[in-house]
UniProtKB/Swiss-Prot annotation:
Superkingdom: Bacteria
Organism: Shewanella oneidensis (strain ATCC 700550 / JCM 31522 / CIP 106686 / LMG 19005 / NCIMB 14063 / MR-1)
GO biological process assignments: DNA replication; DNA synthesis involved in DNA repair; double-strand break repair; SOS response
Entry GO MF terms: ATP binding; single-stranded DNA binding
Protein purpose: The RecF protein is involved in DNA metabolism; it is required for DNA replication and normal SOS inducibility. RecF binds preferentially to single-stranded, linear DNA. It also seems to bind ATP.
Keyword annotations of the record: ATP-binding, Cytoplasm, DNA damage, DNA repair, DNA replication, DNA-binding, Nucleotide-binding, SOS response
Protein name: DNA replication and repair protein RecF
Gene symbol of the encoding locus: recF
Length: 360
């Protein structure tokens, strides 16, 4: 799967751009503020319905316009597919796939699986467990068709349970919701655990190339003590849940733990090593997607030269090329990427003041 055509209209400082990317490495270069990262952001927005840089979607709309429009043609095994997204300053969103209106943004994500390696994506290890849960759930969503419905049911029941706790409801009234909560939690936890086990098999080899002297152990924690029955835990923790007004333990507290010896990876590794570990996680996730459902991710790699030294840039780009996936990578100077590749980029684009030019 790859993007073979991309139209961007009124997205940040890009008023209008048309790109015909290659299936391989696409190098986008230009000075800071030129709009090169906005191209990556537009691709991400088209696949996720939101930005990886700002949670306020209205900010990505060009200041002089009341809406943005993104359109792409995808090359898929079954043939070409067209996807389009329009976001209004009012917050309304219109999505179409092959001319048909789509109501759920999750359909976009399913159609266009995207992996991001940016300065912001390194928060996967530096921040709390939420980003690591999202990492697990990205993979579970794309590789198991039952995950999305189960997780949406967990969220629905958890919201109802927390509301009852805030209302001071007695436990006999909450028990009905607990039965639902337990059922869907078992489904979500099983899928997550199975996914992390599969990821681990691929991850060991990739980490070995990035960090050959480091033994990183990766494990899944489900959000409560693995030795404790979840039904018994919910009942015994009811007084605490009631006091706090929310459910303290459960699948919404799950985490992906990475350790070196007895220490969390965040404490044992340097910042540079942690960046390489995040790159390994992203590459393993893309490879697993291809292995399990025969579908490539699209990789968006922003500002690589500022994040990794020349040796590790070369290693990362080699790994990305080996995935066979389509890659979009940005840099201020093209030489920083070109010199790190064994063969020239498949296509190069220069961006200046929001204008995109293909370099022949």
């Amino acid at each position: 799967m790859s993007l073979i055509r991309l139209n961007i209209d009124s997205f940040r400082n890009i008023q209008l751009a048309q790109l015909s990317p290659s299936e391989g490495i696409n190098l986008i270069y230009g000075q800071n503020g030129s709009g090169k990262t906005s191209i990556l952001e537009a691709i991400y927005f088209l696949g996720m319905g939101r930005s990886f840089r700002s949670h306020l979607s209205q900010r990505v709309i060009n200041n002089d316009q009341d809406k943005l429009t993104l359109f792409a043609t995808l090359n898929l095994p079954r043939g070409d597919s067209k996807i389009g997204l329009r976001r209004f300053r009012s917050g309304e969103t219109e999505v179409k796939i092959d001319g048909e209106k789509v109501k759920r943004l999750s359909t976009l994500a399913e159609t266009l699986p995207i992996q991001v390696i940016t300065p912001e994506s390194f928060s996967l290890l530096f921040e709390g467990p939420k980003s690591r849960r999202q990492f697990i759930d990205w993979g579970a969503f794309h590789t198991d068709p039952q995950f999305y419905a189960a997780w949406m049911n967990v969220r629905r029941v958890l919201k109802q349970r927390n509301q009852m706790l805030r209302n001071g409801s007695p436990y006999d009234q909450i028990q009905y919701w607990d039965r639902e909560f337990i059922r869907y939690t078992e489904q979500v936890t099983e899928i997550r655990n199975r996914y992390v086990d599969s990821l681990n098999e691929l991850l060991k080899g990739i980490i070995g190339e990035f960090l050959p002297q480091v033994d990183v152990k990766v494990s899944f924690t489900r959000g409560w003590d693995s030795k404790t029955d979840f039904a018994q835990l919910l009942e015994s923790q009811y007084p605490r849940d009631l006091a706090t007004g929310h459910t303290v333990s459960g699948p919404h507290k799950a985490d992906l733990r990475l350790r070196v010896g007895t220490l969390p990876a965040q404490d044992a590794l340097s910042r540079g090593q942690l960046k390489l570990l995040v790159c390994a996680l992203r590459i393993a996730q893309g490879k697993l997607l291809k292995q399990q459902i025969d579908k490539h991710s699209i990789y968006l790699v922003d500002d690589l030269p500022s994040e990794l030294d020349a040796q590790h840039r070369q290693l990362l780009l080699k790994q990305l090329v080996d995935t066979g996936a389509q890659v979009f990578v940005t840099a201020i100077e093209p030489a920083a990427i070109v010199d790190s590749l064994h063969t020239p980029p498949s296509r190069m684009f220069h961006v200046e003041h929001g204008r995109v030019t293909v370099i022949e």
